[in-house]
Amino acid sequence: MLQLKDGLSLKSQLSLVFYHTVVLLLLTQSCGGQPQVIGPLRLTVSIVGDDIILPCHLEPATDAAAMTIEWLRPDLDPIFVHVRHHGQEILINKHLSYEGRTSLFIDKLKHGDISLKLSKVKLSDEGKYRCFIPSLDRQSIIELVVGAVSSPVISLAGLNKASSGVVLGCESKGWYPEPEVFWLDGEGNILSAGPTETVRGPDGLYTVSSRVTVEKTDTNRFTCRVQQQNINQTRETHIHVP
């Protein structure tokens, strides 16, 4: 039998080429033959009470108007957040907490945009959502992080007799996740303050409070800043001490 330089017979090499060709065709059909369901690369963040869009689209852009589109949360029972079938929303088995708060952009479906609009976001909406097209057997996971914020309130808490300084108090209610509290002087420098007191209410929201003793400065202007880095939110209040 004819042998090639690498020691394989011509028949063996032809078989190997045929095998690789078949594998390539299968990969092309499975990956390139159907559109993919694409979600965002980063977390989607919303504040309680806001409207939010959970991004999801077909790539390449494909008309999804006639497709069944399912938005799900696997951790819920029932798991269905929004289902569109035969051009209509299916309300059977939709989770009660999402009734009247979800919608698709009907005019954008023909361009492959299957994003979900979620109105009046609740704290309980936080979680992982699945954007799923059954006919394509394709899906994408979109994670929603929900936050709650409020502006802090500063009060004159008293006098420090030992240092003749003024004690300032700061409180901010209704935060989620748990925030940090900072005191700043008129130049923006962080002041040394006592430990932050944190209380979590039955609604899951946090109340934080802090005290600081300040001395007179050129401006006598001080700031209480409350921030939560995970949701990229900051609230602050200023006070001028006479």
Model-identified regions with their sequence ranges:
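Proline-enriched interdomain boundary motifs that mark the N-terminal boundary
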Residues: 34-40, 148-158
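Extracellular/luminal immunoglobulin-like beta-sandwich modules
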Residues: 63, 124, 129-149, 221-242
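Core motif of extracellular immunoglobulin-like domains
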Residues: 56, 71, 129-131, 144, ...
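N-terminal V-set
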Residues: 59-101, 176-195, 223
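Extracellular Ig-like/FN3 beta-sandwich strand-entry sites
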Residues: 51, 124-126, 165, 217-221
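N-terminal Sec-dependent signal peptide, specifically the hydrophobic helical h-region
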Residues: 1-48, 144
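Ligand-binding face of N-terminal immunoglobulin V-set domains in extracellular IgSF glycoproteins
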Residues: 51-57, 68, 99-144
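Short edge beta-strand/loop segments characteristic of extracellular beta-sandwich folds
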Residues: 53-59, 167-173
